[in-house]
C-alpha cells in the first residue's frame, strides 16, 4: 500500500511557506526581462499579481489562474505569472500545460531554482522520471540547500528503486533542518524501502515527536507497522491520521488494506468506498478495493475495480498483475496470463507478478513453467513467503511431494503461515500418507480463518479417504464455498433436502453437479430416494441422458439447461450420501445398478463375434483438463507390453491425444480396435462395455460406467488416488466387480502395467 504523498507541493501548499511565492512577489524582484508597461498600468499589474498569488496560497485556484492570465494579457513575458500559472495547472491535473508554462518562465529567468523543482513535479506526474530527476538536479545545482528540491528528488529516487540515494537526500535535509518532520517521515519511507523496518519506524516516531498531529507521519508509521505484522497498531495509526484529517484518502486506503489483512473485508470495503468517493482519480484505492472484493469472493466486481484503476494508471505493473489474479478466480487463466505478462513487461522483477504468473500457469496445467516462475521470484527475493508457498504448489502438481513440503516448511520459518499455506502444506502431508498430521494442519487453517472453505473441504476429502464418512460427508458440503466449484451452485427458492422432512408425496429435484463420473457413481441414490415415496426429477448432463432414461419409471429426466417444473425440494447428487448417513457398510452397492440397451448390446455382440477372445476394453487417459490428469492418465506407449498377447484390445477412448497418436496408430496395426466413431453417447459405450470380457481403465468416467454395469474391471490408480478409492484396498465398496491396482512409486506406472499383464494372463 502506498504511504501518503511525498513530493513537496508546489508553492501554494498550506503546510509550508512557498519559496516560489516568497521570491517572486516583491516589486523590487520584478522581472527585468518583462516588457515595460505604462506607469499607470504598473500598479494595476502588481495589484493583480499580488491578489492572484494570495488566492493561490488560499487554494482558490480557478480565481488565481484567471488573475495570472490577466497579468499575462498585460505583460506576456511576466516570469512570476508564467511560473505560477504553470504551478496551478499542475495542481489541477494539467501537467503537460504546466510543463510548457514553467519552461517559458525558465527561459526568462534560468537561474531561479524553484521553477526547476516545480517542473520536476510536473514531469513526475507524467511518469517522465528521467526528465524529472534532471530538473531536480538543476534546482539543486542552483541552490544546494533548497529543501523542497531535496525532498522531491529524494522521493523520486525512492520511487525509482534507488532508496539509498533517496536516504542521502533526506539526511542532507535533516542536516540543514534537524526538526523537519517531513524530512524525518520521508527518511523513514526510504529506510522502509531498504528493508530497515525498525529504523524506519524510529524515523516516523521522531517526526511525530516534532509534530504529534502530523497525519502524513501517522500514515507512514502505519505502513511500517503493517509490514512488521503489527496490524492492530497499524490500524490505530491510520485511525489517528483520519481523526486529524478525515479526507486523507491514502490513510483510508491503507486502513482498508490493514483491515483486509485482519480478515475484516466488509469494514475494509467501507473505507475504500469513502476513499474512491473522495478521490475518484486515486488508482490505489480502486486497486485495494479489488483486493478486498476478491477476499469477499466477488471476482467480477474485483476485476471491474482493477480495470478502473488501470484507466487511471495504465502503466502500473501491480494493477495488471492483480487483474490477472481476478481472471484466475473467474477460471479465465489464459486471459490472466496475458495481463500478468503485461505487468512483467512493465516491471520484469515484480515479485507479485512472477507469483501470479505461477498461479495462472498452474491453472493452465503448465506446472513446469509455474515452477520456473517461482524460482525467478526466489532469485530476486529468497525470503519471499508467497513465492515459497507457490513453489510448493507447483511441486505438488508435479508429484514432487517431499520437495513441496520442504518449500512450505521453509515458508513457515520465514513468516506466519496463512490459512491457504497451511492448507497446501496439509495436502502435501496427506499425499505422503501422513493423514493425521494433515487433518491437524487443516484444523490450524480453520482456527486462523474460520470460514476458509478450502481447508474444510480438503479436510472432508481426507476423512472420506480414511473411511470416516460421518465427518467426511459433513465437511464435503463446504465445496459450495470453494472457488471453481461454487460457480456451479444452484440457487433455488425451494429448500435443500438433507434427509428430513419425509418425502412421501413430495417432489424432489436431484441434479448432477460435477463430472460425468460423479453422476454415474451417485445416480444409484435415485432408487434410495424413490423408496421414500418421492416424485423425482433427475437432471443430468446431455451425454448421459440416453443411458439414464432407464430411470424413467422412477424419475422424470431433464438435461442440464432445460426448463424445470415446480418442485418441493432439491438435492445435488453428491449431497445424498450425507442425507442418508451413508457409511462404508451402507453404501448402496448392487453389482449392476445400470443396464445397457438390449438392442444396442445385440448389435455389439454381433460385431465382436469375429474377434479373438478375450476382448479387453481399455481406457488409458481421461479429460486433459481434469485437475489430477497429469497423475491419473498413462501415456499409451507405456502399455506396449500388453499388445503382444493373444487378445483383442478395444479402445474405449472418446478421443486420442496428439501425444498418444503415434503409439495409437502403431498399436492399431497390431490389433488395437477403435470404435470411437460409433460411440455417440454413454448408452453406446455401455452397450459395447457389456460385450467385452473385461475393462482395464484409469480413473475416469469410463471406470464408473464399467463398475455401474457390473463388468469385471481393473482400475489403475496413482499413488495418491481420489478419496472414493479409500486407502490401500484392492477392492471398493462402491463397485463389487472392480479390482484396484495402485502405484507404489508416484508417477511410475511400470509395476502397475506389469501386474495387469500378469493378472490377464498376458505374459
Residue ranges of predicted features:
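Alpha-helical solenoid repeat scaffolds of the TPR/TPR-like class and their adjacent stem/linker regions
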Residues: 1-694, 699-763
Amino acid at each position: 500500500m502506498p504511504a501518503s504523498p511525498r513530493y513537496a507541493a508546489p508553492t501554494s501548499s498550506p503546510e509550508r511557506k512557498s519559496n516560489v511565492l516568497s521570491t517572486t512577489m516583491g516589486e523590487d524582484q520584478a522581472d527585468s526581462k518583462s516588457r515595460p508597461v505604462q506607469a499607470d498600468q504598473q500598479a494595476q499589474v502588481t495589484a493583480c499579481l499580488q491578489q492572484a498569488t494570495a488566492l493561490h496560497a488560499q487554494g482558490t485556484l480557478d480565481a488565481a489562474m484567471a488573475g495570472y492570465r490577466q497579468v499575462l494579457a498585460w505583460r506576456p513575458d511576466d516570469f512570476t505569472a508564467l511560473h505560477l500559472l504553470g504551478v496551478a495547472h499542475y495542481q489541477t491535473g494539467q501537467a503537460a500545460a504546466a510543463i510548457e508554462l514553467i519552461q517559458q518562465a525558465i527561459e526568462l529567468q534560468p537561474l531561479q531554482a524553484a521553477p526547476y523543482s516545480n517542473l520536476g513535479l510536473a514531469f513526475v506526474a507524467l511518469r517522465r522520471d528521467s526528465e524529472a530527476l534532471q530538473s531536480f538536479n538543476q534546482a539543486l545545482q542552483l541552490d544546494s540547500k533548497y529543501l523542497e528540491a531535496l525532498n522531491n528528488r529524494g522521493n523520486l529516487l525512492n520511487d525509482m528503486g534507488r532508496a539509498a540515494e533517496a536516504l542521502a537526500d533526506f539526511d542532507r535535509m535533516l542536516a540543514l533542518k534537524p526538526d523537519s518532520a517531513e524530512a524525518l517521515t520521508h527518511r523513514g519511507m526510504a529506510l522502509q524501502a531498504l528493508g530497515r523496518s525498525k529504523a524506519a519506524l524510529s524515523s516516523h516516531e521522531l517526526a511525530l515527536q516534532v509534530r504529534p498531529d502530523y497525519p502524513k507521519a501517522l500514515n507512514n508509521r502505519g505502513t511500517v507497522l503493517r509490514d512488521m505484522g503489527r496490524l492492530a497498531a497499524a490500524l490505530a495509526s491510520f485511525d489517528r491520521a483520519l481523526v486529524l484529517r478525515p479526507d486523507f484518502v491514502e490513510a483510508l486506503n491503507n486502513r482498508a488494506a490493514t483491515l483486509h489483512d485482519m480478515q475484516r473485508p466488509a469494514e475494509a470495503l467501507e473505507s475504500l468506498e469513502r476513499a474512491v468517493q473522495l478521490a475518484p482519480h486515486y488508482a490505489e484505492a480502486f486497486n485495494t478495493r479489488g483486493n478486498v472484493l476478491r477476499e469477499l469472493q466477488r471476482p467480477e466486481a474485483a476485476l471491474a475495480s482493477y480495470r478502473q484503476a488501470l484507466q487511471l494508471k495504465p502503466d502500473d505493473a501491480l494493477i495488471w498483475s492483480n487483474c490477472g489474479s481476478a481472471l484466475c478466480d473467474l477460471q479465465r487463466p489464459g486471459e490472466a496470463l496475458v495481463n500478468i505478462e503485461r505487468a512483467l513487461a512493465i516491471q520484469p522483477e515484480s515479485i507479485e507478478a512472477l507469483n501470479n504468473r505461477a498461479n495462472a500457469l498452474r491453472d493452465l496445467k503448465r506446472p513446469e513453467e509455474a515452477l520456473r516462475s517461482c524460482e525467478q521470484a526466489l532469485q530476486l527475493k529468497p525470503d519471499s513467503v508467497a513465492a515459497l508457498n507457490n513453489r510448493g504448489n507447483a511441486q505438488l502438481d508435479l508429484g514432487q511431494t517431499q520437495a513441496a513440503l520442504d518449500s512450505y516448511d521453509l515458508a513457515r520459518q520465514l513468516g506466519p503461515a496463512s490459512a491457504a499455506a497451511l492448507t497446501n502444506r496439509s495436502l502435501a502431508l496427506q499425499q505422503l500418507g501422513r493423514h493425521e498430521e494433515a487433518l491437524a494442519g487443516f484444523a490450524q487453517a480453520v482456527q486462523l480463518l474460520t470460514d476458509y472453505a478450502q481447508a474444510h473441504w480438503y479436510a472432508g476429502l481426507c476423512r472420506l479417504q480414511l473411511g470416516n464418512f460421518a465427518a467426511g460427508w459433513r465437511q464435503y458440503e463446504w465445496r459450495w464455498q470453494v472457488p471453481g466449484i461454487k460457480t456451479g451452485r444452484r440457487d433455488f427458492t425451494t429448500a435443500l433436502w438433507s434427509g428430513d422432512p419425509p418425502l412421501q408425496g413430495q417432489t424432489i429435484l436431484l441434479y448432477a453437479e460435477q463430472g460425468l463420473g460423479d453422476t454415474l457413481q451417485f445416480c444409484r441414490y435415485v432408487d434410495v430416494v424413490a423408496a421414500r415415496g418421492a416424485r423425482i426429477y433427475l437432471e443430468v448432463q446431455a451425454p448421459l441422458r440416453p443411458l439414464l432414461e432407464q430411470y424413467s419409471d422412477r424419475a422424470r429426466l431433464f438435461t442440464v439447461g432445460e426448463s424445470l417444473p415446480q418442485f418441493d425440494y432439491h438435492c445435488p447428487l453428491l449431497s445424498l450420501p450425507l442425507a442418508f448417513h451413508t457409511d462404508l457398510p451402507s453404501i448402496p452397492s448392487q453389482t449392476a445398478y445400470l443396464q445397457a440397451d438390449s438392442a444396442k448390446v445385440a448389435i455389439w455382440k454381433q460385431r465382436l463375434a469375429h474377434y479373438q477372445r478375450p476382448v479387453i476394453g481399455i481406457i488409458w487417459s481421461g479429460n486433459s483438463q481434469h485437475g489430477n490428469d497429469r497423475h491419473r492418465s498413462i501415456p499409451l506407449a507405456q502399455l506396449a507390453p500388453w499388445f503382444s498377447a493373444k487378445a483383442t484390445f478395444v479402445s474405449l477412448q472418446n478421443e486420442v491425444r496428439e501425444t498418444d497418436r503415434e503409439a495409437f496408430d502403431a498399436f492399431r496395426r497390431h490389433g488395437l480396435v477403435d470404435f470411437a466413431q460409433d460411440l455417440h453417447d454413454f448408452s453406446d459405450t455401455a452397450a459395447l462395455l457389456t460385450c467385452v470380457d473385461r475393462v482395464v481403465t484409469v480413473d475416469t468416467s469410463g471406470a464408473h460406467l464399467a463398475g455401474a454395469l457390473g463388468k469385471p474391471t481393473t482400475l489403475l490408480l496413482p499413488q495418491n488416488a481420489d478419496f472414493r478409492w479409500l486407502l490401500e484396498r484392492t477392492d471398493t465398496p462402491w463397485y463389487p466387480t472392480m479390482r484396484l491396482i495402485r502405484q507404489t512409486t508416484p508417477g511410475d506406472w511400470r509395476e502397475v502395467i506389469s501386474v495387469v499383464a500378469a493378472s490377464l494372463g498376458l505374459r
